[in-house]
Amino acid sequence: MNVLYLIGNGFDLRLGLPTRYADFLEYYKGQTPQLGSGRSQQEEAIQKYKERLFSEMAEREERGEEQWKDLEIALGEFTTAFGDDADGFCDFYEDMNRSLEAYLSQYNSFEPTSEELEKTRESFIYPYRYFKAKEQNKLRAQPFDKTCYSVNIISFNYTSSIESFCREAFLRSREYSYSEEKHGGGYRVRYQGVQYIHGKLGDGGILLGVDHGEQIANDQFRQCDDVADLLLKPQANEGRGTLVDEECLSLIAGADVICLFGLSLGPTDQMWWTAIKKRFLDNPEVILLYFHYDPSADSTLNFDRRKERRARQHLIDALGLEGHQK
């Protein structure tokens, strides 16, 4: 059985790491552009664009507009401030990207506790442990090969926190054998590693941008390859030449159980939600497990399904499921 975990920023936040875009922007506001010697003129232009960005963000916040709290959406819309100055945008993007990497690098040395490691290991070993008894029986009845769980992870984060957990949790071997006394069976768990769909800190640059051209508000920039190479994440991944897009799409296409943890399911990663939708519709036996953290909706009643219903609707909306597909 192929079990695929997609991990988002909610994972780092649950660890207590200040990795929200709002945390970074507070840091970025106080940084002086530093592109290197001989580029002082570009640095002055960047500073002006930065001031305009924060001014416009403040105005939108006063009007109660929530969309720009997502920095990637904000970047796509802020392109209108540059007119036809594509080089100016590329310099601005470079400065922000480098600053984001510098900021997150401060929190990239995470050492999990033994208790956290054991919990992580159990989560991978028993992917159905979060299901109710009825759902667990349904999973066991599915026509999957349950003698071996192949575990793959796709991280949407830049930090290596999830890899630190897995590296320690599966320190002795990438393959483990487990028995289920309750159900009189056993199986092997094979950990296959982590794919970083947006790049990894200290590994040749990170991807910060949008999913497709329509999310770039500046019409001229939609036709500009220099901008698209940076701002369009699928094109940026292609330029990096790592084949990570193809590898991750293949993992989704072959997954029997897809677990989504800490993901906002926002529009700037729409290609991945579309791929999950395709897998789900192509194979009705595929199971989607979505961990939606909403502490405001917690209830002491285990039959209060409001939180579950809202999470399900959020997933349905993100995948674009319609009618009977739901």
Residue ranges with predicted function:
Residues 2-6, 15, 19, 23, ...:
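Active-site periphery "cap/insert" segments of enzyme catalytic domains
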Residues 12:
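Conserved Rossmann-like nucleotide-cofactor binding loop
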Residues 16, 209, 319-323:
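Glycine-centered secondary-structure boundary/capping sites
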Residues 42, 46-47, 205-253, 303-312:
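Acidic, metal/cofactor-coordinating or nucleic-acid-engaging core segments within structured domains
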Residues 177-235, 259, 294:
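Long, well-ordered mid-to-C-terminal structural blocks that present hydrophobic/aromatic surfaces
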Residues 302-326:
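Acidic, Ser/Thr-rich peripheral helices and adjacent loops at domain boundaries
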